[in-house]
Amino acid sequence: MRFFHSIIVLLFSISTGSAFLLYGCNLSENLCDNDESCYPDGVFGQCYSSESGSPEPTVLDNLDDTQLELLKLELTRLAAKDKDWGDEETQCVLAYFKMSMFYQLQYDPDFCQVRKPANVWALIQLIDTGLTEDPTILDEDVNPENVTDEDMAQIIEQLKEPSLPTEEDIEEALNAQNEDVDDEILDQYVQAVVNNENPDFSELSDGQLNILIGRLVDLKKNVENEEAQLLTGDGEQEMAVPLDDLEERGEQAILKKDIEQVGEINQGLDNTEHKIVKGRKDQVVTRVDANRVYLKVHLKNEDQLMPLIEFLQNTIAIPNNLYFDDFQFENGQLSMRISRFEGAKPKADKRIDSVEGVASAVYKRRKDIARLSGADVRETGIGSGEDGSLPVESSERDWLLMPVLFVCAFTVTALGLVAAVQIARSRRHYKDNIQQIAEQLDGKNSFAYQDLCRQRADGGRASKSSSTSSWCEETAVPTIDISTGHVVLNFLQEYLSEPTKIEAQWNGIKDYRNEERTKTKAEKFASQNRTILPFDDNIVDIDGKTAENEDFYLNASFIYDDDPRQAVYIAAQTPASSQIAAFWQTIWQHGVCLVVNLSTPEECKQEKNYWPDTGSEVHGAFEIHLVSEHIWSDDYLVRSFYLKNLQNSQTRTITQFHYLSWQKESTPTSAKSILEFRRKVNKSYRGRSSAVLVHSWDGSGRTGVYCAVDVLCARLLRGIRQIDVVATVEHLRDQRDGMVATGDQFKLVYGCVAQEVNHLLKSIATK
């Protein structure tokens, strides 16, 4: 009792106006608000603002293999439901997992499997925030129930996907289909017997007759037991019925899962009377017939009762294996007894398994009842409609809906208007003072602020779930000045307006190749190469075995910009079927988080895809699981994978950006789509020390164009004062042959860089 009292105190001590912090911002860039940052919480990051006044989020350290496996299974189940990071159920699961692991609570896989997971998520966040603000709220003598290894293994088993059906399961399913047909026939005979009719039993087989007799005997016993309980009830205490006894009598406990969690819950279908007793024994005792449902109806004449009863039998009772009998009608109130036969299977997809559900179902069908029988249902509930009844649905409550909606709409509109006025005032004030602020700053504090941001990024805290932990986004305000930008733009536009200049440059470098470098390692595996062979001194080495074993060879080269110690790209050919394991080994070994795929779907079909279309696949020592696939435009899509090392059970997240419409040795119809694609890549999760793996069918032409455009645009952001496309292409070809393969691709580099300079100048003018 002291623990629950502490929880109540905790909930009332938390500010109701605090915003809920979203989880998963390391993997989804759009989760956090503008004033929030992604706080490294040891899982997938949590949105947090230091100005909100909320305490810093808790941090999970050193999750063991079992906890990581549990988290993976939860995420797999969410991915199977097409839940994204912003979904309420996803946020509920992440919040509950984090709180359970941090406070060592018993974990329940179905905790968030409710109709409105947002409510559970809100409760978890309130409790977690309160415990963080004041850990002394909980009583010292309340010991949390630690999760044992057996409990965790049992939870993981609940989350695992079901295995494929065996032959016995298939045969049992086929027999069950035949039994459904018999059940429908036998239900009609049982209904006829209950209604005192004389059905013709000659059409039934011997087996069906035996089943029918058994059902009637069981039904008779149930009715007798119910009557005996009513007669022997002492009005003071209800005897508990053990669950084992229910199973021996062929009865079934409803929602057994809930019974195991919170004790025995009577769903109202057993023929029992619940006595609500308050005060002394000599006070009034109110009884509720928990196996009866009543309807308050308005009838023009009692002839309308029969169509009403027939409608209830056909639409509610029969589809759910329920029996409605003992109908009583008095003073505009119709009541009936609800019972259920446990031996048959329900015919409805969503089974009604409580008297409350029956009452709600009747009220929902009140319009159909009025149309077919003329009866007007005004209220439904549990009981016989007398003083001890419990209303479930009533038309008297419906009139409140429109006023409540009106008040809500008015409130939202008023808040929106207030916010709009405040924003307009803030912008007007900002415009009036922007010039004065700019003169005071004179550009000095801007550089100091940028330097501070770089220092904080370099000293950032590492993530627990990956070896890389930074966000690489292009600088919001580029360091290039407007005058330099216009000079560069005029230079590029001059070349684009005179194609002969670009053609002359291309003729000078189209046959350029570095003859001083050797390719002996790649020549050993000639069958694994398409057209381009990587150089020996910058070939991507896998576990130091590239030159020894064909299984550890991948046609890929490290590409450097101005820092020879750190590769910016890994340029590779699209892996053949025999190179898929080496491809994923390369990604794992060199900490790659981003993969840029420039091969068309037609080219990918020539070899087996290195990623699964659905579910997961195992290649070598790695298991690859497809988490999501989003189509961002007609030209490209984005896939997200979980990569698991089967040797040490570590996992990482890999994002693939697939450009679909760029044919080999050609150019896209628009440079704009290439630039949008590049910006999307550069705004995604990338480690400070990890290269971007860029591949096309042969790993040369299209790969070279993408690397050249990205290198030149990145230099512009760093504030260089001149652009040399020819020197950039030669620099790339010094590291891998064939980078930028045709004159049209060379011209595309000019066009992309010119559009990017124009975009930067517009952004500078806007800001």
From Swiss-Prot:
Chain ranges on the Cytoplasmic side, renumbered to this chain: 420-767
Chief location of this protein within or outside the cell: membrane
Localization per Swiss-Prot or TrEMBL: Cytoplasmic vesicle membrane; Perikaryon; Cell projection, Axon; Cell projection, Dendrite
GO cellular component: axon; cytoplasmic vesicle membrane; dendrite; dense core granule; perikaryon; secretory granule; synapse; trans-Golgi network transport vesicle
All copies of domain Tyrosine-protein phosphatase, residue ranges: 527-756
Leader peptide range in chain numbering: 1-19
Cross-referenced SMART domains: PTPc, PTPc_motif
Record keywords, A-Z: Cell projection, Cleavage on pair of basic residues, Cytoplasmic vesicle, Glycoprotein, Membrane, Signal, Transmembrane, Transmembrane helix, Transport
Membrane-crossing residue ranges in chain numbering: 399-419
Gene Ontology terms describing biological process: exocytosis; positive regulation of anterior/posterior axon guidance; positive regulation of neurotransmitter secretion; regulation of secretion; ventral cord development
InterPro entries attached to this UniProt entry: IA-2/IA-2_beta, Prot-tyrosine_phosphatase-like, PTP_cat, Tyr_Pase_cat, Tyr_Pase_dom
Membrane is among the record's keywords: yes
Superkingdom of the organism of origin: Eukaryota
Modified how: Proteolytically cleaved probably at a dibasic consensus sequence by egl-3.
Molecular function per GO: transmembrane receptor protein tyrosine phosphatase activity
Knockout-associated phenotype: Viable and fertile with a reduced brood size. Locomotion is slightly slower and the expulsion step of the defecation cycle is often missing. In males, impaired mating turning behavior characterized by abnormal repetitive turning during the first turn. 50 percent reduction in dense-core vesicles in ventral cord neurons. Paralysis induced by acetylcholinesterase inhibitor aldicarb is reduced in 50 percent of mutants. Resistant to aldicarb-induced reduction in brood size. In a unc-64 (e246) mutant background increases dauer formation whereas in a unc-31 (e169) abolishes dauer formation.
Family: Belongs to the protein-tyrosine phosphatase family. Receptor class 8 subfamily.
Function recorded in the entry: Regulates dense-core vesicle (DCV) trafficking and/or secretion. Probably by controlling DCV trafficking, plays a role in the AVG neuron-mediated formation of the right axon tract of the ventral nerve cord. Involved in locomotion by regulating acetylcholine release. Probably by controlling the secretion of FLP neuropeptides, regulates the turning step of male mating behavior. Plays a role in preventing dauer formation.
Protein name: Receptor-type tyrosine-protein phosphatase-like ida-1
Primary gene name: ida-1
